[in-house]
């Protein structure tokens, strides 16, 4: 009985705390990119219990052939959602987000300069940053006031397989991973013109064969956390906010004890308070949870949780109480409560999605 009671008590505690941190006026909406069915599923998240209610399914118009994944990003003012398509044609689809209902209204399809594995806006919301895995480059596209993505104003060749790109909190620097180059590109960013230029040094190296993929900035401790796809290692990197450069501090594994035939790490996210970090691995279909040391930012493994089949993408809600993971091969989403004391995941419910769900965005509106 003791082994069963623990998770139930933790769940009750997590839900009770969640109920106290969400403003009554806020509504939380979830957006799931489902590539093979060319859909974005919109759901509403109940902050009291983590339940998800379907709102609508939106088709990305003008797509003749789907491929790969559906990277998405939400503008800083929460007015627009951008979705990149990787088939035919390759576009950045802009949608206006209705603040009351969370529903999406298509604005336009803007041109992309290649197949983009990752997109993000700069901190002003005036530029779309994108990383192209097969085309080995990063790009900057202006975003018009109505949300339309304009043609690229800058295309920067990179080492092989650019995989992710993000600005730092100051919007003065941008980092981008090169999986095949085993490095993180370090750029200066002119936010007035939307121009990238090499930083000094222009890159931070990682171990050969690691395969840098996704990364996150910690909200307060001056660290960047990097997930490497090919060996499932997680790097803790000190981030110098004055210079926009990185220095390795710790390396540990996101793999469970039983190793897969093919290591294929995918995504990672921090809770908004920076207390816990999670990473998915597609070969084992697991989520690794880590506790972040409040003093020095180092990581300690919490546990591995079995999840959806081939979990390419997941997200954590703005309260930090719920984690939503999707499976490319299971065509479904599983919701979890995050124990606020331990960081352990408590499974709540599974929901059907479209075909090949692989990207999740969550936002509080208004």
Predicted regions and their residues:
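A short beta-strand motif characteristic of beta-propeller blades
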Residues: 53-64, 105-110, 151-156, 199-205, ...
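Conserved beta-strand positions in repeat-built beta-propeller and related beta-rich domains
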Residues: 32-36, 83-87, 130-133, 168, ...
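Bacterial N-terminal signal peptides
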Residues: 10-20
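Short glycine/acidic-enriched loop and turn motifs that connect beta-strands
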Residues: 37-39, 87-90, 134-137, 181-183, ...
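An edge-strand/N-cap motif at the start of beta-rich repeat modules
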Residues: 26-47
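Loop-centered beta-sheet repeat module
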Residues: 175-232
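Short loop/turn segments immediately following beta-strands, especially the blade-tip
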Residues: 43-50, 95-102, 141-148, 187-196, ...
């Amino acid at each position: 009985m003791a082994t069963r009671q623990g998770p139930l008590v933790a769940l009750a505690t997590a839900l009770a705390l969640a109920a106290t941190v969400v403003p009554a006026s806020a509504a939380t909406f979830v957006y799931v990119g489902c590539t093979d069915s060319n859909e974005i599923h919109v759901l509403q998240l109940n902050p009291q219990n983590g339940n998800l209610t379907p709102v609508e399914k939106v088709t990305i118009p003008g797509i003749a052939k789907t491929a790969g994944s559906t990277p998405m990003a939400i503008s800083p003012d929460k007015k627009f959602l951008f979705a990149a398509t990787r088939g035919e044609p390759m576009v950045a689809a802009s949608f206006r987000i209705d603040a009351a209902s969370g529903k999406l209204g298509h604005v336009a399809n803007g041109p992309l300069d290649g197949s983009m594995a990752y997109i993000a806006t700069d901190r002003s919301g005036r530029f779309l940053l994108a990383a192209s895995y097969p085309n080995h480059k990063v790009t900057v596209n202006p975003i018009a006031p109505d949300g339309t993505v304009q043609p690229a104003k800058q295309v920067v060749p990179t080492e092989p397989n650019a995989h992710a790109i993000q600005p730092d909190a100051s919007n003065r620097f941008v980092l981008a991973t090169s999986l095949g180059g085993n490095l993180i590109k370090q750029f200066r960013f002119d936010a007035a013109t939307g121009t990238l230029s090499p930083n000094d040094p222009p890159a931070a190296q990682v171990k050969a064969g690691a395969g840098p993929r996704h990364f996150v900035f910690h909200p307060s401790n001056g660290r960047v956390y990097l997930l490497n796809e090919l060996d499932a290692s997680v790097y803790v990197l000190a981030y110098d906010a004055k210079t926009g450069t990185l220095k390795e501090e710790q390396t540990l594994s996101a793999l469970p004890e039983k190793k897969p035939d093919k290591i294929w790490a995918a995504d990672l996210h921090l809770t908004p308070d920076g207390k816990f970090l999670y990473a998915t691995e597609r070969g084992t279909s697991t989520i690794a949870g880590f506790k972040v040391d409040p003093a020095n930012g180092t990581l300690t493994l919490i546990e591995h949780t079995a999840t959806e089949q081939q979990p390419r993408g997941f997200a954590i809600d703005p309260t930090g109480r719920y984690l939503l993971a999707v499976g490319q091969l299971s065509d479904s989403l599983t919701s979890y409560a995050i124990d606020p004391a331990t960081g352990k995941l408590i499974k709540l419910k599974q929901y059907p999605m479209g075909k090949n769900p692989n990207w999740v965005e969550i936002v509080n509106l208004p």
